[in-house]
Swiss-Prot record:
<feature type="binding site">
    <location>
        <position position="37"/>
    </location>
    <ligand>
        <name>[4Fe-4S] cluster</name>
    </ligand>
</feature>
<feature type="binding site">
    <location>
        <position position="102"/>
    </location>
    <ligand>
        <name>[4Fe-4S] cluster</name>
    </ligand>
</feature>
<dbReference type="GO" id="GO:0008137">
    <property type="term" value="F:NADH dehydrogenase (ubiquinone) activity"/>
</dbReference>
<keyword id="KW-0813">Transport</keyword>
<dbReference type="InterPro" id="IPR006137">
    <property type="entry name" value="NADH_UbQ_OxRdtase-like_20kDa"/>
</dbReference>
<dbReference type="GO" id="GO:0005886">
    <property type="term" value="C:plasma membrane"/>
</dbReference>
<dbReference type="Pfam" id="PF01058">
    <property type="entry name" value="Oxidored_q6"/>
</dbReference>
<keyword id="KW-0411">Iron-sulfur</keyword>
<keyword id="KW-0997">Cell inner membrane</keyword>
<dbReference type="GO" id="GO:0015990">
    <property type="term" value="P:electron transport coupled proton transport"/>
</dbReference>
<dbReference type="GO" id="GO:0045271">
    <property type="term" value="C:respiratory chain complex I"/>
</dbReference>
<keyword id="KW-0472">Membrane</keyword>
<keyword id="KW-0479">Metal-binding</keyword>
<dbReference type="GO" id="GO:0050136">
    <property type="term" value="F:NADH:ubiquinone reductase (non-electrogenic) activity"/>
</dbReference>
<dbReference type="GO" id="GO:0005506">
    <property type="term" value="F:iron ion binding"/>
</dbReference>
<feature type="binding site">
    <location>
        <position position="38"/>
    </location>
    <ligand>
        <name>[4Fe-4S] cluster</name>
    </ligand>
</feature>
<dbReference type="InterPro" id="IPR006138">
    <property type="entry name" value="NADH_UQ_OxRdtase_20Kd_su"/>
</dbReference>
Amino acid sequence: MGVEGILERGYVTTSADKLINWARTGSLWPMTFGLACCAVEMMHTAAGRYDMDRNGLIFRPSPRQSDVMIVAGTLCNKMAPALRKVYDQMPEPKWVISMGSCANGGGYYHYSYSVTRGCDRIVPVDIYVPGCPPTAEALYYGILQLQNKIRRTNTIAR
């Protein structure tokens, strides 16, 4: 958030936008949409070594309880409508992280007739995490970049 001004009497002044965005970055609840081997690396970020819980990131089982969707793995054409349906069930504001080469652009299976060439053709993607599969550190870095993106957005329309 960044403290804009600390006054002599011990209180802080800031804008409502920055306060709301600070609260949102500290309580992201991702929903897993694990489709292939990238999902295993996504599970590593929730394990003891990286422990996303300490930063307020708690995996939720329902799209109605989450505000971030992590699409990890190869998205087939038959799975694309289900991805869109789950995305539509998420409350606003919502963000999407595309994890891995297959989710980003089809990856190794790019020329297959049954593979969607990137989940950004189905849902709007905010952060792309490259790799095949990307490491847990790369996903964690992508989450940090999403937090930076949220801090830069204007929450209140003028």
